């Protein structure tokens, strides 16, 4: 099927208008989830304070992880539309049960005679008895926090993305083998991207001699981050790359690959830089050593900050409608959110490119072969 440029623009416009409209529906249906520590407050909230709580909860719903996959919530009936996820915790023994036992954070879950409550920021705490409450001050519970290995919303999307990538690229590999290195179907879309990563990222930064050993990781990390960023643009409250734990894991993996594949020249330039006076070597060595750990940290923060900032900007623009409650502001907010959403598509691909490019730079510096005699002659 062939689309004209005009038809394609219409499809894209409808696609993002639908996303924005669904986001409006999520905002109007989202209820503030009060923590147990605030349950003792009896003061009556004003309409402005209630709206602020709803807006804050709407933002939190889209940027934080959760133990259930919630799509919509009916404010009048209190009905949640979504599905629970498995809870896996360690508290002197392994406990496995459904997140539905928490009843969206309003109930105590029982497992093998122990009782647990879902607290602030989706952390699970042990409580005393079926009616146990969280205790503490300033929203910091003093209850015992258990080790949480649950399949949360972010973990589920990691699995979905991994399966999607396996399905796409295993099919691409089969089409290559079957048709004599000629991609077919959806592989025609991904083949130029694979070649771009190889020819414009891997080879220029790592070199033709060593790039092949890193291609698997570079391709995986590029498409992995890109797909996760695209999922984050949907109104489903998925924000995997805006989770500092996820980006930290990606940064640590890059750090380990760089460290364990580096050659002696790499370590020589760190601990005893050639061509530099000895007093300067003593000063530069700890700085270079610190740089080893700063690089993956920069990778982690760059991706995390850019993605979560984009989500918060979009959510804040949507919230303007319910703050000003005017038709003009509604139209303005909708159009501005539409434009920002389109920019976010570019940012999703750009952040995947930057992460892959920086990883390739680190790998290239780790395997670079230096010729000191020529360089410092």
Tell me the role of every PLM-derived stretch.
Residues 234-240:
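Membrane-interface helix caps and helix-loop-helix hairpins in membrane proteins
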């Amino acid at each position: 099927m062939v689309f004209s440029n005009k038809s394609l623009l219409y499809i894209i416009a409808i696609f993002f208008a639908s996303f924005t409209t669904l986001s409006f529906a999520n905002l109007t249906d989202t209820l503030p989830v009060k923590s147990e520590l605030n349950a003792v407050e009896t003061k009556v909230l004003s309409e402005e304070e209630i709206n602020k709580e709803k807006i804050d909860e709407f933002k939190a719903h889209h940027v934080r992880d959760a133990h259930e996959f919630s799509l919509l919530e009916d404010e009048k009936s209190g009905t949640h539309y979504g599905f629970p996820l498995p809870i896996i915790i360690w508290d002197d023994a392994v406990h496995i049960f459904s997140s539905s036992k928490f009843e969206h954070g309003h109930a105590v879950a029982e497992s093998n005679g122990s009782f647990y409550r879902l607290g602030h920021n989706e952390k699970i705490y042990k409580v005393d008895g079926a009616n146990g409450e969280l205790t503490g001050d300033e929203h910091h519970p003093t209850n015992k926090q258990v080790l949480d290995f649950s399949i949360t919303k972010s973990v589920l999307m990691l699995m979905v993305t991994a399966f999607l990538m396996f399905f796409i690229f295993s099919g691409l590999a089969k089409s290559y083998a079957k048709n004599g290195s000629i991609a077919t179907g959806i592989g025609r879309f991904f083949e130029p991207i694979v070649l771009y990563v190889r020819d414009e990222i891997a080879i220029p930064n790592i070199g033709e001699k060593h790039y092949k050993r890193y291609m698997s990781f570079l391709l995986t990390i590029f498409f992995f981050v890109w797909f996760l960023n695209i999922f984050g643009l949907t109104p489903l409250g998925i924000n995997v790359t805006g989770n500092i734990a996820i980006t930290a894991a990606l940064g640590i993996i890059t750090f380990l690959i760089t460290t364990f594949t580096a050659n002696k020249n790499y370590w020589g330039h760190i601990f005893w830089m050639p061509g530099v006076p000895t007093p300067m070597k003593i000063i530069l060595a700890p700085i270079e050593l610190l740089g080893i750990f700063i690089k993956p940290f920069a990778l982690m923060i760059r991706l995390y900050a850019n993605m979560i900032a984009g989500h918060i900007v979009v959510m804040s623009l949507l919230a303007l409608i319910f703050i000003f409650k005017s038709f003009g502001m509604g139209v303005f907010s909708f159009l501005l959110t539409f434009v920002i959403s389109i920019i976010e598509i570019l940012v999703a691909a750009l952040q995947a490119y930057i992460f892959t490019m920086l990883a390739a730079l680190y790998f290239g510096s780790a395997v670079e072969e230096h010729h000191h005699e020529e360089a410092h002659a």
